[in-house]
């Protein structure tokens, strides 16, 4: 494994199209493996660009101030409030307890795992995404799942920082490392990286928790709105 800690090299790595999140293998439609293989997060190249454009368009429809108010007025623990507020902002149905549980199950298996309950969770969620396009439905689930744990961690950190979300983001960012895999042999700075080599990027101390370059998180402002709203409504 190659570990990269210098900001310049991390930014170069995040902009390198040959360093990608570990690609998903895929599976039958409606399974957890299929979801991983269908979201923008684990895609690369033209497929990633197309899926990311859809995600960006979905997020662009959401008003940050309205989302903040939704988060302030929604009941439940932090993850439940995040999921229900964001779903409402996306014009999805009200999430009942079963839907929230399903999203939490998917979140727990998003980066790997073979829990059969995750397949059932994906199948429960797909009809709630209000689209007949399976790829769009998968990426709507992805938006919800990717907002869940990281934003909840940011809220928890902000509570420890007297409610200051921006201070928490600087002092204790919810994402400390990012992982990449070289799909071909490549180079970052003076470091040669072999094909298939795993790469660990220590982004947390450098203020790069939302990434950099073509894969920078498109939901940064909405994550902050969710966190601030949740803290207002505590």
What are these regions (language model features)?
Residues 73-123:
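Flexible, acidic/His-enriched mid-domain "rim/lid" segments that flank
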Residues 205-234:
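Cytochrome P450 heme-thiolate "Cys pocket" and heme-binding signature region
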Residues 1-94:
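Active-site substrate-recognition loop segments, prototypically the cytochrome P450 B′-helix/B-C loop
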Residues 128-132, 162-197, 201-204:
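Conserved cytochrome P450 K-helix E-x-x-R motif and the immediately C-terminal K′/meander segment
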Residues 6-9, 51, 150-155, 222-230:
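Catalytic-loop motifs flanking and including active-site residues across diverse enzymes
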Residues 9-13, 165, 231:
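A generic structural signal for short hydrophobic patches within well-formed alpha-helices
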Residues 77, 142-145, 149, 214-225:
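Short, conserved micro-motifs enriched in small and acidic residues
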Residues 82-83, 102-107, 120-166, 227:
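Central I-helix of cytochrome P450 enzymes
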């Amino acid at each position: 494994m190659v570990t990269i800690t210098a900001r310049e090299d991390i930014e170069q790595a995040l902009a390198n199209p040959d360093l990608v999140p570990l690609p998903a293998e895929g599976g039958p439609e409606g399974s957890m493996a299929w979801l991983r293989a269908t979201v923008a997060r684990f895609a690369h190249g033209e497929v990633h660009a197309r899926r990311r454009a859809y995600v960006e368009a979905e997020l662009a429809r959401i008003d940050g101030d309205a989302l903040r108010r939704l988060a302030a007025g929604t009941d439940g623990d932090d993850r439940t409030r995040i999921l229900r507020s964001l779903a409402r902002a996306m014009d999805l149905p009200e999430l009942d307890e079963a839907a929230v549980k399903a999203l939490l199950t998917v979140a727990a298996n998003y980066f790997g795992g073979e829990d059969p309950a995750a397949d059932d969770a994906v199948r429960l969620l797909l009809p709630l995404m209000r689209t007949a396009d399976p790829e769009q439905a998968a990426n709507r689930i992805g938006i919800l799942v990717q907002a869940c744990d990281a934003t909840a961690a940011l809220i928890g950190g902000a509570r420890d920082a007297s409610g200051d979300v921006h201070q928490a983001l600087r002092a204790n960012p919810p994402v400390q490392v990012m992982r990449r895999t070289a799909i071909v042999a490549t180079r970052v700075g003076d470091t040669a990286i072999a094909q298939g080599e795993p790469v660990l990027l220590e982004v947390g101390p450098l203020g790069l928790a939302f990434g950099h370059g073509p894969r920078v998180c498109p939901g940064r402002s909405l994550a902050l709105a969710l966190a601030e709203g949740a803290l207002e409504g505590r």
